[in-house]
Regions:
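Short glycine-aspartate micro-motif
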Residues: 64-68, 147-149, 200-202, 225-229, ...
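Glycine-rich phosphate-binding loop and adjoining helix at the ATP-binding site
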Residues: 95-114, 118, 127-132, 156-219, ...
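Short, solvent-exposed loop/turn and secondary-structure capping segments
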Residues: 77-79, 160-163, 239-241
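Contiguous N-terminal and early-domain "leader" segments and peripheral loops that mark the onset or edge
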Residues: 8, 31-39, 52, 60, ...
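Glycine-rich phosphate-binding loop of actin/hexokinase-like ATP-binding domains
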Residues: 86-91, 171-180, 211-321, 327-331, ...
Length: 492
């Protein structure tokens, strides 16, 4: 087979270049949208106040509950914080019955969730649970309640640390009577109906949880400044000065602890530059967006997150297969693409293929060959085909990593975080940053190309994997919430 296939792959790959000048333009626009989001509501970057006003330092202690409703599974865990940056975690997971995901009544769903919490307590914390029932029977004074962090991964309007109204359901859920209601109150109502010793102390976003978990397990001099997820989706949360959040004066919210002068902001950066003033936009990006179920929104996420990179690659491969001889039998190969290959199906290519192909250093790209067979049922792809695939994978993955530097650089610059000699700690989670080879390296290359960061600023940024924001992170937010509540009671 001629190298025309490779030439074409190289040409397409160039369209995914994201040079230093573009990174710098992106950073300027991100800072503009970031400040706009801190000033007012209904902006491109939501910049949601979380009402979490401090981060842990690793000495926190206690037993907390966390529940996570983010998709088809419901997870209940208890986290015992040992006070020395370590913790132990016990958990159970249950699939949510399909009929509850789209039922007429939110009460059914939340009662189901509360029953799972009850079952978990009876199995794992039975002594505490029985003692609670005993005290309740005897009517003896002060109850010992478990504080619970509720990770609820749907769009919510947060109005307090444990108060947030559901904006809309996503991910296959559709229970209209919950929309516009406070999801913490719905869960608490179901818990109270079953008379459980549990208080919903905090509404948790998993990205904020990532930041908190990192701050507890890897405390530096200053605590963690930013948490970011680069996985199926992408988002970031960071610590902002209260006096840089003018919209706190105008939005409706419950009382909160102002003593630290700071608050974690949930950026919701997947929607950065929805109007495409600075983001790169290849033909494949345009097609993916037009055929998605939410055209015109989450434009940053559609170029960065795992859910979409596989689809961008699939479209580029399909284009080359249809027009430029990729995966076509030739002198050196008897390649076969069956009709039922997922190459021909939207969302048919899982992003894990990209990590495998990027990591393949074998002479004849055997791992890539195997991956094409496993993922796309393509048999006996030639080495030239595999090289073309690797060329495209490299370009798409590298662009995603370089784009990821944009919000990071922008937040570092806008908050003045690089003005001191302190290290800036960043906690990251997600399959891309964890498994895609050199994702952090490409991200740092782009960071250094931003003049206000440069090599000196890049050296101050410490990036570490932070696992389980919706478990240990949620528990830590419940802890901070109960401390804040106690402080405010005292102040009154």
């Amino acid at each position: 087979m001629s190298s025309a296939v490779l030439d074409e792959a190289t040409r397409i790959a160039r369209e995914f270049d994201y040079p230093a000048a573009e990174v710098q333009r992106g950073v300027k626009e991100y800072i503009r949208e970031m400040d706009e989001g801190l000033r007012q509501e209904h902006t491109t970057l939501s910049q949601i106040p979380t009402f979490v006003t401090s981060v842990p330092n690793g000495t926190e202690k206690g037993l907390y509950l966390a529940v996570d409703l983010g998709g088809t599974n419901f997870r209940v865990c208890s986290i015992d914080l040992h006070g020395d940056t370590t913790f132990s975690l016990t958990q159970s997971k249950i699939m949510i019955p399909r009929e509850l995901m789209a039922s007429g009544s939110s009460k059914d769903l939340f009662l189901f969730l509360a029953r799972q919490i009850e079952a978990f307590l009876r199995i794992h914390h039975n002594e505490h649970f029985e003692a609670h029932l005993q005290r309740r029977r005897e009517g003896s004074g002060e109850e010992e309640l478990f504080d619970l962090g509720f990770t609820f991964s749907f769009p919510v309007r947060q109005m307090g640390i444990n108060k947030g109204t559901l904006i809309r359901w996503t991910k296959g859920f559709n229970i209209p009577d919950a929309v516009g209601h406070d999801v913490c109150a719905l869960l608490q109502g179901a818990i109270d109906e079953l008379e459980l010793p549990v208080r919903v102390a905090a509404l948790v976003n998993d990205t904020v949880g990532t930041l908190m978990a990192r701050s507890y397990t890897s405390p530096g001099e200053t605590g963690t400044f930013l948490g970011a997820i680069f996985g199926t989706g992408t988002n970031g949360a960071y610590l902002e000065k209260l006096d840089r959040i003018p919209k706190m004066q105008t939005i409706e919210h419950s009382d909160y602890d102002k003593s630290t002068g700071e608050m974690i902001i949930n950026a919701e950066w997947g929607s950065f530059d929805n109007h495409l003033s600075v983001l790169p936009n290849t033909l494949y990006d345009q097609q993916l967006d037009a055929d998605s179920n939410n055209p015109g929104v989450q434009m940053f996420e559609k170029r960065v997150s795992g859910m979409f990179l596989g689809e961008i690659l699939r479209r580029a491969l399909l284009d080359m297969h249809n027009n430029k001889g990729l995966f076509k039998p030739g002198q050196s190969s008897d390649v076969l693409v069956p009709e039922n290959s997922t190459l021909f199906r939207q969302w048919g290519l899982d992003t894990s293929l990209l990590s495998t192909v990027e990591a393949d250093k074998t002479q004849t790209l055997e791992q890539t060959k195997t991956a094409l067979k496993d993922h796309l049922k393509i048999e006996q792809a030639s080495t030239t085909d595999c090289k073309a695939v690797q060329t495209l994978v490299h370009a798409i993955g590298k662009r995603a990593a370089r784009l990821s530097a944009v919000p990071l650089a922008a937040v570092l610059i806008a908050t003045g975080k690089l003005q001191t000699d302190d290290l800036v700690d960043v906690g990251v989670d997600g399959s891309l940053v964890e498994f895609y080879p050199n994702f952090e390296g490409y991200m740092r290359d782009a960071l250094r190309e931003v003049p206000e960061v440069g090599p000196a600023g890049d050296k101050k940024v410490r990036i570490g994997i932070s696992k389980d924001g919706s478990g240990v992170g949620a528990a830590l937010i419940a802890l901070v919430a109960s401390k804040e509540e106690a402080r405010m009671k005292k102040a009154k």
